[in-house]
Amino acid sequence: MPSGTGTSACYLAKHTDLRVFTAPCVGDSDYLKKQIYELDKDSKVQILNPPKKYHFGNLYKELYEIWLEVCKSGVEFELIYDPVGFMTLFANLDKLGSEILYIHQSGILGNITQKQRYERKLKIKDHK
């Protein structure tokens, strides 16, 4: 699951027997570790690094493209955190088991304006 402060990942790991993996979307892995540690010093959350640094809220063509691809599943994902989560997931498949549960944890209302930003700034058209 993608994380800002890691709160959802921390409490999911604390209260289930699942192996919980998260990806930093707001800061780097050190920032995320610190945030999680403040909530639970014994947290078992495993942090996976994205394939490259994405600055929060900035537009990246590859993030929009992966978002379009995963939305073909019939589920609309959020356009800021989820693309970083999926890029990280796909880059780290070798570290994960054969069964993966991706937790969709965020709203999609912001997608309207985020798509407009992509269309305006990067000249990307909605292919859905």
Mark where each language-model region is.
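PLP-dependent amino-acid enzyme catalytic core
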Residues: 1-128
